Amino acid sequence: MPVKLGAKSDVAIDSKLSSLNPVALVLHNDDINSMDHVVQTLVSNIPEITVEEALEKMLKAHNFGTVILVKCPLERAELYQQRLITNNLITTIQT
């Protein structure tokens, strides 16, 4: 016989499943910030990104308009996004 879960159980399961579906934190090119500022901000605020990766990602955003910085759970992406916005970088989150 199938087990029927209650509403609270469904919410808990949905929450756990959403953390398994990573989102993409995307950096957008801008004409305001210096390249050095972008690299330093990425390294200082996203632990997964090394200096070399930050430089590469900054150049991709500069040349192509956008670049995916990281793929991670939504909550972490929102935290990183707030940190980057505080430092005047333009970011979006894509599901």
Describe the role of every protein-language-model region.
Residues 1-95:
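Terminal domain-initiation and capping elements
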